[in-house]
């Protein structure tokens, strides 16, 4: 995929992410607690669900972003229990890249290790919000690996948003829309994402404190 095509595809993904962020309709809350809310609605991208997580994280937007950013130097693999490794396959620009992420087994090994190959665009907005915008792609240097089930991320990512009057807090809104592939009971998938997203926020809070506290 050349730069022009990648830019066009990634901009379309980023626009979808903005639509998800702005559209308040159709969301059903499936998990709440510790200041974090997880909701879902049916995906229009694949026969599954789009999940939204919302929570306030103690830390500046820059600190939170350093922990979650899908860029070189990210701290993500050091704290996120759902990420074994994150590697940049190819950087097209400072904010546009191809990545490969591997995840461990989960739900008492009912979900075996996965890998995901994505095109990622980072956007910065005038109000200081930083967003990551990702979707699955194929890349010649990353054919399927027999050690992993290849999963597919449909438009997903996060928004790190400053809180007016609260410089040391960040509103983090996340969107997950993942086809885990393999032969998984839908009940396993439906229970996994809300629980793992709630855990993501709890672990992120600890990570910001550990790395920047």
Curated annotation (Swiss-Prot):
Chain ranges of the START domain: 1-213
PROSITE patterns listed in its UniProt record: START
SUPFAM superfamilies xrefs: Bet v1-like (SSF55961)
Keyword line: Lipid transport, Lipid-binding, Transport
Keyword Transport attached: yes
GO molecular function: cholesterol binding; cholesterol transfer activity
Record-linked Gene3D superfamilies: 3.30.530.20
Protein name per the record: StAR-related lipid transfer protein 5
Species per Swiss-Prot/TrEMBL record: Bos taurus (Bovine)
Lineage, opening ranks: Eukaryota, Metazoa, Chordata, Craniata, Vertebrata
């Amino acid at each position: 995929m050349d730069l022009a095509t990648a830019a066009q595809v990634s901009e379309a993904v980023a626009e979808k992410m903005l639509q998800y962020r702005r559209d308040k309709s159709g969301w059903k809350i499936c998990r709440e607690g510790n200041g974090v809310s997880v909701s879902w609605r049916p995906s229009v991208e694949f026969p599954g669900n789009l999940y939204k997580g919302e929570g306030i994280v103690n830390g500046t937007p820059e600190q939170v972003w350093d922990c979650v950013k899908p860029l070189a130097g990210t701290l993500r693999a050091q704290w996120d229990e759902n990420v074994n490794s994150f590697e940049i396959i190819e950087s097209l620009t400072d904010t546009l890249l191809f990545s490969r992420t591997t995840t461990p087994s989960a739900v008492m090994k009912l979900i075996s290790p996965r890998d995901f190959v994505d095109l990622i665009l980072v956007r910065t907005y005038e109000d200081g919000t930083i967003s990551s915008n990702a979707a699955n792609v194929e890349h010649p240097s990353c054919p399927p690996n027999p050690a992993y089930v290849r999963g597919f991320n449909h438009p997903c990512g996060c928004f790190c948003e400053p809180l007016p009057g609260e410089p040391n807090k960040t509103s983090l809104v996340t969107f997950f829309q993942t086809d885990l592939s393999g032969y998984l009971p839908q009940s396993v998938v439906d229970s996994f994402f809300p629980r793992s997203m709630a855990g993501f926020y709890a672990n992120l809070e600890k990570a910001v404190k550990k790395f920047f506290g």
